[in-house]
């Protein structure tokens, strides 16, 4: 399973990136079969290496047991905040989301809640730069899944800035939690969300998107969230995906045994 474009992760220095890219080439060359968790990743390996891969995604469960009282712990109100849940690394585009928010008409109206450990080098940088702003709230990692799903569910909108592929589990969880999603514009996110999200590719685009977010929420939130929930139930249920993995593994074994 090839995961994402690991060599593009900016937490690695240039030498490590080159080594990881070499690992990618060796994996493609020497593996009998490749698995891609995202159609964008599958297309990448086809175009770059001429190698086919099997699309087998991750999954998520649709939840119904949300607890609005969880918000009190963070001083939040239902529908009254933006949220981003991510590892605080450059390739997840926290800077783009935060700077876009700061320049928008939503700054001071709805706080931006950042969920993720701040003890990474980039997390420390973000804390130093933005941590004193009362409208940007770094709450650390949240590992109580029910609590995290509730905080996602009651958000006004959810930023998803991941950019190096493939299918990020936190995106599926946001969809399964009924979030109105604001996604970084790349092939991996579009492969999952299709037209059921708003997209931004720069700080200015994020600002423009947020300046019109109230109208977008009124016009599209119900439609987009319902469609995303249907996508999770149809394409990303664990029962379906476990069956697909089992079938593919059986097929691989049959090939190794000569059919």
What are the residue ranges of the model-derived segments?
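Membrane-proximal helix-turn-helix segments that form the acceptor-binding/catalytic region
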Residues: 16-33
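Conserved donor-binding/catalytic core segment of Leloir-type glycosyltransferases
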Residues: 72-103, 113
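Nucleotide-activated donor-binding/catalytic signature segment of Leloir-type glycosyltransferases, i.e.
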Residues: 124-146
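Short hydrophobic beta-strand element within catalytic cores of glycosyltransferases
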Residues: 176-183
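A charged, aromatic-enriched C-terminal amphipathic alpha-helix characteristic of glycosyltransferases
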Residues: 218-257
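Short alpha-helical donor nucleotide-sugar binding micro-motif in glycosyltransferases
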Residues: 141, 149-155
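Aromatic "clamp/platform" in nucleotide-sugar-dependent glycosyltransferases that forms part
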Residues: 162-163
